[in-house]
A protein has these predicted regions:
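Phosphate-handling catalytic cores of nucleic-acid transaction enzymes
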Residues: 1-183
Length: 183
């Protein structure tokens, strides 16, 4: 239910990002056409369109380390991971490309996140990230997410557990002795 509070805003931001990206792609295409049609003697220089940020409110848990860092950079350091099943994040942590426990620990303290890759001479840095995480799940899903309290991730989460009296609810067709086809 909590995720629904910002769903409409997320849709608005996502739509705006997609529209900005489409407009950018159109401008790039027009820019390329102008360059091809210009004469070599034409000295006028046209600026290349600037690519807009692609912002989202919710960042999916099923995302790689590099992509979450990219989302945070695009969002100016902010993001929300909200999943109804905690094992979505737990399963990602088991993948080589998705182990971002250190990113979550650093984000909790708003410490700088950075990454550098040889390909394309890529450098990404997010100062003072504000990343919120809201998960729901069973105790077994939590143990899949946080296998040990030793790495510090456990202490950065608040857990809320409650007991519910288990009552059997008979959902069979004859449960209430009402024939629904004749009723």
């Amino acid at each position: 239910f909590a995720k629904m509070l910002a769903d409409e805003y997320h849709s608005f931001v996502l739509t705006a990002s997609r529209e900005s990206e489409a407009q950018y792609n159109q401008e790039v295409s027009e820019h390329k056409q102008k360059l091809h049609s210009k004469k070599k003697s034409d000295a006028a220089f046209e600026e290349v369109p600037v690519k807009p940020s692609f912002k989202v409110v919710y960042i999916p848990a099923n995302t790689s380390y590099a992509k979450i860092l990219w989302h945070l950079e695009q969002n100016e350091g902010t993001g929300i991971i909200c999943e109804t099943e905690a094992d979505t994040l737990g399963n990602v942590f088991k993948q080589e490309w998705g182990s971002y426990s250190d990113m979550l620990r650093k984000s909790f303290h708003h410490e700088r996140l950075s990454s550098s890759r040889k390909g394309n001479n890529e450098f990404t840095e997010v100062n003072a990230p504000s990343l919120s995480i809201a998960l729901s799940g069973t105790p077994n899903q939590v143990t899949g997410l946080i296998s040990s309290s030793e790495d510090g991730l456990f202490s950065r989460f608040i857990f809320y557990a409650f007991k519910v009296e288990q009552k059997w609810k008979d959902v069979s067709p004859n449960a209430n002795n009402i024939n629904l086809t004749e009723h």
